[in-house]
Structures are given as C-alpha cells and as structure tokens.
Swiss-Prot record:
<feature type="compositionally biased region" description="Low complexity">
    <location>
        <begin position="623"/>
        <end position="639"/>
    </location>
</feature>
<keyword id="KW-0812">Transmembrane</keyword>
<feature type="transmembrane region" description="Helical">
    <location>
        <begin position="923"/>
        <end position="943"/>
    </location>
</feature>
<feature type="glycosylation site" description="N-linked (GlcNAc...) asparagine">
    <location>
        <position position="1015"/>
    </location>
</feature>
<dbReference type="GO" id="GO:0140359">
    <property type="term" value="F:ABC-type transporter activity"/>
</dbReference>
<dbReference type="Pfam" id="PF00005">
    <property type="entry name" value="ABC_tran"/>
</dbReference>
<feature type="transmembrane region" description="Helical">
    <location>
        <begin position="35"/>
        <end position="55"/>
    </location>
</feature>
<protein>
    <recommendedName>
        <fullName>ABC transporter B family member 15</fullName>
    </recommendedName>
</protein>
<dbReference type="InterPro" id="IPR036640">
    <property type="entry name" value="ABC1_TM_sf"/>
</dbReference>
<feature type="glycosylation site" description="N-linked (GlcNAc...) asparagine">
    <location>
        <position position="769"/>
    </location>
</feature>
<feature type="glycosylation site" description="N-linked (GlcNAc...) asparagine">
    <location>
        <position position="646"/>
    </location>
</feature>
<dbReference type="GO" id="GO:0005524">
    <property type="term" value="F:ATP binding"/>
</dbReference>
<feature type="transmembrane region" description="Helical">
    <location>
        <begin position="82"/>
        <end position="102"/>
    </location>
</feature>
<keyword id="KW-0325">Glycoprotein</keyword>
<feature type="transmembrane region" description="Helical">
    <location>
        <begin position="184"/>
        <end position="206"/>
    </location>
</feature>
<feature type="transmembrane region" description="Helical">
    <location>
        <begin position="158"/>
        <end position="180"/>
    </location>
</feature>
<feature type="glycosylation site" description="N-linked (GlcNAc...) asparagine">
    <location>
        <position position="542"/>
    </location>
</feature>
Length: 1240
C-alpha cells in the first residue's frame, strides 16, 4: 500500500512539473532570448539588495565604531556612499532588462497561445463539441481570462519570483562572506519559511481548478442567455436565468473564502522572520562579545538572512499565481495536444486525380457519440450515381441530415463503409475530401464580418467577379446591391442583420463559389419566400447539372425533378425511385407524403388559373431586393434623440468610484471592519519591528557586556511577540478580505448580468456587445475588482498605517534626518505612479483586444460545423491575427515604459540610501544626532520605503482594476431605453390582444438610412388570426420585433388593447405574448426544462408539459427517446433535428397560454406529415387568440381570418385568402400564390 502511495506521489510531482512547463510551451526563439535577458535582469535586480547590505555594513561600522571627530570619518562615509551610487547605476540596467523583456515576452507568448488554442479547438471533430456541452463558454474563458492569467504570470509574477529567489541566494552569499558562523546558524530558518509556501501552492492547484469548474457552469448559463437574448426576453426568462446563474456562483464563493484562509496562514507563517530576528539578535550579541565581530557586520548578516527569508516568502506568495497559470496552461495544452480521430490537419490520405462524385453507403451502422443508446442507422445502404441528384425525404429525425454529416466525415460510422468513386472516405485526405463538397444547411451560419467575406469562406482565393457571379446564381446580388455598403455590409453576429431568406441566399452563394463536385443541400430553400425560392431553386438546379447532388427537403415540390428519390424511415431506405415511379405505388410512403401536401394546396390549385402573371412577378422580384431586414444595431445606432446621447455615453464610462464599490460591499461591513483593523495592526507591526531593529544595532556598539545582554533580551522577546501577532493578524486579515471580495464578485456578476438583461435588443446587436465579449467581461472584470477590493485594499490600509506611524516616529527621534528621508520618498512614489498611469492607458487597448479575440472565438465555436465543412480554419486564424495587430504594437510601447519605470524606481532607492547615510554622517559629525538615533530613524523610514515600494508593485493591478471597475459601472449605470421593469409601467393581468400600428416609421438602429417602415399602419383584430406575407426583406419579421418591443419605432405608435405599448410594464406584457421563431432557440438542458421555460408560473404540472407537447406533435417523438422528457438537448439543441427543435419550441409557446401568439415561420423546419399535424395543432391553439403568422409557405395561412400583404415596408393588400385571390393577376397575393403553385 505504501509503495502505491509513493508511486502516486511521484506521478503527481511529474504532473506538477508538466503543468509548469505548459506555461512556456508557446515560446519561440525570440521569446527564449527575451526570457534569457529578463532572467539576467531579474537575477541582477535580486543581487542588488545583498550588495547594498554589504556596503551598508561598512557604513554602519564607520558610524558606530569610529571617532566622529577624525578627518577619515566623512571620507569613509563618502567613499561608501559613492559605492552605493555605482550599485544604483547597475541596478538601472538590470531592472530595465527585467521590466522590458518579461512584459514583451508575456504578450508575445499569450498571443501565440490564443492562436494555437483556437486553432486546436477548430481542429477537433464535431463529436468533441457534442460531448463537451460547455465548449463555447470554455473557449471564451480560455481566450480571455485564462490567457490573461498566463500573461500576468509571465510579465510580472515570474520575474518577481526570480528576483526574490536571487535576493535569497545573494543574501546568503553575502552572509557567509561576512560572518559564516552567524549565517550557518540562520540557515535552518529557510525550512520554516519554505514549508508553508509549498503547502499553500499545492492546496491552491486543487482550489483554483475547482473554482474554475464552478465558474464555468455559471459562465455557460450567462453565455446561453445572452446569445439567445430574444428568446429570454420573449419568455420573460430573465429571473430564471439570474436565479440559475446565482446558484451556480455559490460554489466558487465558498472555495474563494477557503483560498483566502490558506493565503492568510501562509503569509502569517512568514512572521517566523520576526522570531528569527529574536534568535539572531541574541546569537549576534554573543558574536560581538566573544568573537570580536562588529555591530554593522552582525546587522548586515542578520539582515541578509532575514531579507533573504522574506524574499523567499514573497517569492512563494507568487506561487498562487504561478500554480493557477500552470493549471490553466495544462488544461489549454490538453486541448492543443489533442489529436482528433478525424483530423482535418492530417496531410495523410489519398487525393483522387479525377473525381466523378459517385457516393455509396454500405451497411452503415451509426449512433451519435452523445446519444449512444439511440441507434440512427443499422445496416444503412444508399447509392448516389455520379452527376445525379438524389433526394432524401422522410419524417423529422429519420436520419436524413445524418447522411450529410457522415459523408462530410463530421463523424465516422461504427460499422460499414462510405465510398466515393469506390474509395472508402476514411482513406482520403480529410481536407481534400471536404473541398470537393459544397454544403448549404437548414439553419445558415454566417460570421460577423462582411457579406463578401462570408461568401469567400467558400473559396479563399476567389476574385470579386467570382463573388458577384455566385451571388447572382443564388439570387442574392440584387438585394446586396441595394444595401448602402453593398458587399461590404456587415451581417452582424450570427448574421442577425439579415433576414432568414437573405442569410440563406448568402449561404448558397458561399457553396456555389466553391464549384464543388458534390453538392449537399440540407433544406437549402426552406427559409425563402415563394418568389425567391423559385429563382434560387432554378439556380440550384443549374448548379446541380453535372454534379452529384444530395438534396434533403420537407417540401416535396422542390425535389420532384430529382433523378432518384429515396425515402428514409427509422434509419433505413424504404423506397427508391423517380417521382413518377414512386407515385405509381399508391400505398407507398412517398405517395402518401405527396398526397398530404397536395391536400394543403387543393384550394389554391382550384382557385388559381396560371396565366398572365409575368409582370406582377417581375415587380415582386424587383421589390424584394429593395428592403433589407436588418435585426441589429451598432455603435452609431439611433432609436431617437435620447438614444444618441445614451450610446455616446456608453463609450465614455465615468471615472470609477471606490466609494461606490465599497457601498456594494455594505452587507459584509463586519468583515470589512475586522479586515481593516487587522490590516492597520499589521501595518503598525512594520515600524515597531524597524524601531526594534535600529535599537538592536546600536546595542552592538555598547562596551558593557551586561548592558548588551540586558537590552538584547528585551529586543529578542519583542521580536517573538511581533511574530505571534503577525501570524494571527494575517489570518484574520486575509479571511475577512477574501469573504468581502468573493461576495462582492458574486454580487457584481449577478448585478451585471441582471442589468445586461434589461438592455434593449439593439444594444446586443452592436459588434462590441457580442455574447463572447459580455461573458468575458463577466468573468474577468469581476475577478479583477475582487483583487482590488481584497488584496489591494488590504495593502493600501497596511501602507497608510505603516507610513503614518513611521513618519511620526522618525520625526520624533531625529527630525532633521527624517525630513530629508521623507522628502525623497515622493521621487520613488512618482516613478511608480508614472508607471501606473502609462500602463493604465495601455491596458485598455489590451482588454479591448482580448474582447475581440473572445468574440471571434465564441463565434467560431458556435459555427464549428460550417467552419469544418468549408475547411475555413485558416480564414478564422487570419481574422484572429488581424484582431491582434493593434494590441501587438501597443504591447511593444508598454514594454519600454515598463522597463524604464522599474529601472528608475529601483535605482532611485539605492540613491536615497546613499544620501541618507551621507547626510546622517554629517549630522552626527556636527553633533545634531547620535548613532542610535540614525540607526532607528534609518530603519523606520527605510522600512516605510519598502512598504511604499510594495504598494508600488501593485500599480499594474491598480491600472487593470481601475479599468475593470470603470467597465463594471459603465454597465450598471447605463440607461436602458426600453426598460422592462419600468415602475410606472401599466401592469395587466390579461389582455384581449388587439394590436394596432399607427403611422409607424422604423429603421433598424444599425442602418438608419434604410427605412423599413414609413407611415406604416395596420390593425390586427383581437382573437383573430392575421397572416403577414410578402417578399423576403419586406418587413414581416419587423412587425413581430415591434410587438415584442425588442425595438421602438422612430415615429408613430404601436398599440395593444388601445394603449401605447410603451406605457406597459414590459415584462408583464410579454407574459401574455408567445413567440415561435424561424430558427428555434433551445437551451442546454433537458426537453422538460426547455418546455417549462415557457411557463408563467413557477409550478408546472407534468400533465401540463405533456399536454403542451401533444399539442405541438412532440410527445410521440419525445417518448420514443430513451430518456424521454429528460433527454439532454445539447448546446442550442444540437442533439435534436430541426423539426424536433421546432416542435419543442412550439410546445414551450403553447404552455405559456398566451393572449397573443406570434409565429415566425413556425412550421418551416417540419416535414410534411409533422407540418400538417402541427398546423392543425397551431390552428386549434390560435382559436380565441390574437395570432400573427408569418409564412413563406402560403398553404399554411389560407385559413387565417385575415391576410396582410407587405411590399417595400408598406401594406399593399389585405383580406381573406379567397377575397385576395378574387383580385386576379393584378393582385400581389395572387401572384405569390401562383408562383408557389407553379413551383409545386
């Protein structure tokens, strides 16, 4: 058993060293050179103090043991003072190297680490992201706060450690040279100083990992809510999110307090230094009495041992950060070193010289890695001939999209093989394989860059002409050309500034520009309106010519021209043939599906005679390009005069108030009081110790042995007393400040998230407020503020206490010398303060750069399937490199200032010592002070200088802390233009649901020059269903955004029940409105939790959940899953098919029992059979409710009480289905129906 424990211990040591190495794994040749020079600088800086002590011993011996009236007295003093000035010059050089080199290499290595980490994450196979449900928040944390931890260690904490270690070594060398007997006696005290530090470091590794794991859970809650803020707002889920976030934070609070206690015990243990002085004073007196040692030499050796010990203790206090960085670095290296099973970077594998595109699935067996109990394919076979179009149809969740995922090698099958041109795809080079395919997914993933850049994701080296041609082929060129910035228009995070149809057309252009051999279309036209769909369908059919095409569609009218149609059911192909062949089998699966869809269109086919519709359709085609459905906002967004002021203030946060920060800590006032008292007492210990030390030195120069023994006993006991006090006070101080800091951090995070979730949707649409950037601020800023209030506040109180007491004592003992020594203190303070100001101005840009990196990382991970499909990893890495260019330049400047600041402050300290001794010698010679007064005053005020220097060492933390506090209050103080909790708002228990738009003007804040509505009016009757139809980008979804009050109109009024929507208490109003969006947003929880999210009450019965699921036609598929309602949905519902997600979203809305139901393409993702049943369910749910239905598929809205037709942001027609058709070919609705009938 003992041997096993020994082996385990050995393994832990190896792991520890391995994790420490991980901090430096990102260094290149230049970094090693910088670290080498920085090492010389840090070691040189450390050796400066022992050298100063060596010279000081000579000065003290001159002062204490010489006759003050001789001519040689001042000569000796002057000579040794000049020697101190030489040391100061050398100190300047080494300190500059230390400051410059470490700051520079810290930024270089962390920038490279971010790049390697993101590259490694994007290299992982899709299965990795399925299994790591918090991967998005993990990546944000690693790219922002984790890289910040490593940069802090490399730039500041590591050089501090090296400097402290070299001070320790240098001190012992000087001690042995001057008085080896005393040095040997002091040697055992090292053990007493080292053990607490090592124990603390070991405990900290465990605690810091646990804290990180605890916060990751909270960060994931926040990231989900912010990235899906429209869903959170629509379902009034803010309080649920805050409650879940708060619960997740509680664990990290307890661990943080535990960490503070461990730190208090460790630093308190350094009080052993005082006890050591007690022993060394006694033993030193014996050296003086019996071995002829001089007092100055005894002091220098004892001081060297004490300073060496204190330095080692100070170095060990940096272990906290060092081990934390090692823990972070190890976790990051695990990801970087992870080689995925399906490796897109692996150059091995065949590249076919000429690819025909014949695809074959042979006896494939497959389950998703995250749902091993649910079999998707078992002995699945499919053959796609070269150059042919094969359409896959079947129920939602039958495995159609899995075919595309397996063909692209997102996953590998468990058994069987997949062949292209007779070659198994696992033998082909992964990147080459994917380059032969063009993918258009059901939910198009766009990146927060320009339209042009998004299309170029398909082909890196394409020309502008290629981009335009691809856009024309996907029917996107016209609407892009109408935008003010054309192809340079920013699409926003996840493409939020584009309508669904516009996003889909950009995604199709991205696939077409690739000129792929194999075209994969997964519901490629599901988001398009009728007119766009027809043209894009033609474009896709043209693109399919000569290419192998696999087409998945619920709308069977889009696939009737396919060469082969295969019906998938329960993971098997149950029918195969052409449309005509399959229709011959009346009882077949395919003919049944077609029959279901034809029933929906019977009325249309009877009513419409397809005739002279070319002109109207042409008009529609032109009109659909004019308006752009922007859903976003940017830094110069405008929602009215008050908002202009509001947004400009966003960018200018007021100077942070420390008083306000303390006010937030008011509930912990007892801990604050105890902590401050403890810090004040610990501050007083330093001057008391210095006074005892100065007095003790003067004792060594006494001639009476009895007097030496008596006074030595008194001072030795006082040192022991100080040691005990120091231990107890430190424990109290660090525990209380950790308690304060942790609860403040929790409170700040809760209040920030709570405040953020009151901001208008336009704020989230701005580039700088992406979910990644906000989560990064939640993680990082609160941590920095905690450090400011905890560790830094304690240090400030200590410093004030020590300085006040020391200055008073110095002035009482020897006022002339004290005044000179106090007068030069500001010089050192100014150096540190200047360094702080320079670093503060530059740290802002560093933080901004990390936000940019976080935003990019979050977006990349969210769209990892698209990146994988298009092998766009390199393009993302170039975007990251571009985002870091500006901060790289700033870092170089920052390094120079860091070097100069440290060099000046450290070298001036030695200069002041030279001045103190020279001037003190003059005062002694002139008879103004005694040697005892000089030693006491010098010790007291020099120790104060050290305290100020220690306080100065936190200038970097203060700079970062000040920015973080400013960032926190900028969020907390921001005025919300659409306040969901307006106390004056009208709260209503129920609404009838009459909606009216009166002379509404509206443009999305990001593009105020593109008018969506101008004098727009519409009345939606209570309890009736109103369908909104029209071309893509005509303003249909904008109506829903205004009813939900995501935005306010620029002019005019939106009324509900005859009352201006702005007069309502917004959250109470939203309780009566339910939204089902085109792209359903689910949260990472169980199906049950996602449905309950729609509940207004906190207590929802199981029967209500099942009833809602049945109404949405979801109950059957949910109960067929192994875990049933407890099935985990995955991040954003990735574990479920599009149709399954949509049905859960509908169930969530049904559970709300709303007065107003908003359906934005609610059935677009469903297959025909599900659509019919859900459509019936929705129609039942719509009875007696005000329903606003947006649909491209006109067959789904013909039973609505009223149909409103929009074009170019205007209401051009209104009536029932039959009354609008009766207008004939001149009517726009007639034309839209005719287009769908033609394509059907």
């Amino acid at each position: 058993m003992g041997k096993e424990e020994e082996k385990e211990s050995g393994r832990n040591k190896m792991n520890c060293f391995g994790s420490v190495r991980s901090i430096f794994m990102h260094a290149d040749g230049v970094d090693w050179l910088l670290m080498g020079l920085g090492l010389i600088g840090a070691v040189g800086d450390g050796f400066t103090t022992p050298l100063v002590l060596l010279i000081t011993s000579k000065l003290m011996n001159n002062i204490g043991g010489s006759s003050f009236n001789t001519d040689t007295f001042m000569q000796s003093i002057s000579k040794n003072s000049v020697a101190l000035l030489y040391v100061a010059c050398g100190s300047w050089v080494v300190c500059f190297l230390e400051g410059y080199c470490w700051t520079r290499t810290g930024e270089r290595q962390t920038a490279r680490m971010r790049e390697k980490y993101l590259r490694a994450v994007l290299r992982q196979d899709v299965g990795y992201f399925d299994l790591h449900v918090t991967s998005t928040s993990d990546v944000i944390t690693s790219v922002s706060s984790d890289s910040f931890v490593i940069q802090d260690v490399l730039s500041e904490k590591l050089p501090n450690f090296l400097m402290s270690a070299s001070t320790f070594v240098g001190s012992y060398i000087v001690g042995f040279i001057l008085l080896w007997r005393l040095a040997i006696v002091g040697l055992p005290f090292i053990v007493l100083l080292v053990i607490p530090g090592l124990m603390y470091g070991r405990a900290l590794i465990s605690i810091s990992r646990k804290i990180r794991e605890e916060y990751n859970e909270a960060g994931f809650v926040a990231e989900q809510a912010i990235s899906s803020v429209r869903t959170v707002y629509a379902f009034s889920g803010e309080r649920k999110t805050i409650s879940k976030f708060s619960t997740a934070l509680q664990g990290s609070v307890k661990l943080g307090i535990k960490q503070g206690l461990a730190k208090g015990i460790t630093i308190g243990s350094n009080g052993i230094t005082f006890a050591m002085w007690g022993f060394m004073s006694w033993y030193g007196s014996r050296m003086v009495m019996y071995h002829g040692a001089q007092g100055g030499t005894v002091f220098a050796v004892a001081a060297a041992i004490a300073i060496g010990g204190v330095s080692l203790g100070g170095g060990l206090s940096n272990l906290k950060y060092f081990f934390e960085a090692a823990s972070v670095g190890e976790r990051i290296m695990e990801v970087i070193n992870r080689v995925p099973k399906i490796d897109s970077d692996n150059p091995d594998g065949h590249k076919l010289e000429k690819i025909r595109g014949e695809v074959e699935f042979k006896n494939v067996k497959f389950v998703y890695p995250s749902r091993l109990e649910t079999s998707i394919f078992d002995d699945f076979c499919l053959r796609v001939p070269s150059g042919k179009t094969v359409a896959l149809v079947g129920g939602s969740g039958s495995g159609k999209s899995t075919v595309i995922s397996l063909l692209q090698r997102f996953y590998d099958p468990l058994a069987g093989e997949i062949l292209i041109d007779g070659v198994s795809i696992d033998k082909l080079q992964v990147k080459w394989l994917r380059s032969q395919m063009g993918l258009v997914s059901q939910e198009p993933a766009l990146f927060a860059t320009t339209i042009k850049e998004n299309i170029l994701f398909g082909k890196e080296d394409a020309s502008m002409d290629d981009v335009v041609e691809a856009a024309k082929a996907s029917n996107a060129h016209n609407f892009i050309s109408q935008l003010p910035n054309g192809y340079e228009t920013q699409v926003g995070e996840r493409g939020v500034q584009m309508s669904g149809g516009q996003k889909q057309r950009i995604a199709i252009a991205r696939a077409i520009i690739k000129s792929p051999t194999i075209l994969l279309l997964d519901e490629a036209t599901s988001a398009l309106d009728s007119e766009s769909e027809r043209v894009v369908q033609e474009a896709l059919e043209n693109a399919s010519i000569g290419r192998t095409t696999i087409l998945i569609a619920h709308r069977l009218s889009t696939i009737r021209n396919a060469d082969v149609i295969s019906v998938v059911k329960n993971g098997h192909i149950v029918e195969t043939g052409s449309h005509d062949e399959l229709m011959e089998n009346i009882d077949g699966q395919y003919s049944t599906l077609v029959h279901l869809q034809q029933i929906e269109k019977q009325d249309i086919n009877v009513s419409v005679k397809i005739g002279p519709i070319s002109d109207p359709s042409k008009d529609i085609r032109n009109s659909s390009r004019v308006s752009t459905l922007s859903r976003s906002s940017s830094a110069n967004s405008v929602t009215g005069p008050s908002t202009i002021k509001n947004l400009s203030e966003d960018n200018k946060p007021q100077l942070p108030s420390f008083k306000r920060l303390l006010a937030m800590n008011l509930p912990e006032w007892k801990q604050a009081l105890y902590g401050c008292i403890s810090a004040t007492l610990f501050g007083a210990i330093q001057p008391a110790y210095a006074y005892s030390l100065g007095s003790m030195v003067s004792v060594y120069f006494l001639t009476s042995h009895d007097e030496i023994k008596e006074k030595t006993r008194i001072y030795a006991l006082s040192f022991v007393g100080l040691a005990v006090l120091s231990f107890l006070i430190n424990i109290s101080q660090h525990y209380n400040f950790a308690y304060m800091g942790e609860y403040l951090t929790k409170r700040i995070r809760e209040r920030m998230l709570s405040k953020v979730l009151t901001f208008e949707v336009g704020w989230f649409d701005r580039d700088e407020n992406s979910s990644g950037a906000i989560c990064s601020r939640l993680a990082k800023d609160a941590n920095v503020v905690r450090s400011l209030v905890g560790d830094r506040m304690a240090l400030v109180v200590q410093t004030v206490s020590a300085v006040t007491i020391a200055f008073t004592m110095g002035l009482v003992i020897a006022w002339r010398l004290a005044l000179v020594m106090i007068a030069v203190q500001p010089v050192i303070i100014v150096c540190f303060y200047t360094r702080r100001v320079l670093l503060k101005s530059m740290s802002k840009k560093a933080i901004k750069a990390q936000d940019e990196s976080s935003k990019l990382a979050a977006e990349a991970v969210s769209n990892v399937r698209t990146i994988t499909a298009f092998s766009s990893q390199e393009r993302i890495m170039k975007m990251l490199e571009k985002a870091q260019e500006s901060p790289r330049r700033e870092s170089i400047r920052q390094s120079w200032f860091a070097g100069f600041g440290l060099a000046m402050s450290q070298s001036l300290t030695s200069c002041t010592w030279a001045l103190d001794f020279w001037y003190g010698g003059r005062l002694i010679q002139d008879g103004y002070i005694t040697a005892k007064a000089l030693f006491e005053t010098f010790m007291i005020l020099v120790s104060t200088g050290r305290v100020i220097a220690d306080a100065g060492s936190m200038t970097t933390d203060l700079a970062k802390g000040s920015d973080a506090v400013g960032s926190v209050f900028a969020v907390l103080d921001r005025y919300t233009s659409i306040d969901p909790e307006d106390p004056d708002g009208y709260e209503t228990e129920r609404i009838t649901g009459q909606v009216e738009f009166l002379d509404v003007d509206f443009s999305y804040p990001t593009r105020p020059d593109v008018i969506i509505f101008k004098n727009f009016s519409i009345k939606i009757e209570e309890g009736k269903s109103t369908a909104i139809v029209g071309p893509s980008g005509s303003g249909k979804s904008t109506i829903i955004g205004l009813i939900e009050r995501f935005y306010d109109p620029l002019k005019g009024i939106v009324k509900i029940d005859g009352r201006d929507i702005r007069s309502y208490h917004l959250r109470s109003l939203r309780r009566h409105i339910a939204l089902v969006s085109q792209e359903p947003t689910l949260f990472a929880g169980t199906i049950r939790e996602n449905i309950i999210y729609g509940g207004v009450s906190d207590k929802i019965d199981e029967a209500e959940i099942i009833e809602a699921a049945k109404a949405a036609n979801a109950h059957d598929f949910i109960t067929s899953l192994t875990e049933g309602y407890d099935t985990y949905c995955g991040d954003r519902g990735v574990q479920l098919s599009g149709g399954q997600k949509q049905r859960i979203a509908i169930a969530r809305a049904v559970l709300k029992n709303p007065s107003v139901l908003l359906l934005d393409e609610a059935t677009s993702a469903l297959d025909s059979q599900s659509e019919r049943v859900v459509q019936d369910a929705l129609e039942r749910v719509m009875v007696g409710r005000t329903s606003v239905v947006i649909a491209h598929r006109l067959s789904t809205i013909q039973n609505c009480d009223a149909i409103a037709v929009l074009d170019k942001g205007k209401l051009v027609e209104r009536g029932t289905h039959s009354s609008l058709l009766s207008k004939g070919p001149t009517g726009i609705y007639f034309s839209l129906v005719s287009l769908q009938t033609t394509s059907g």
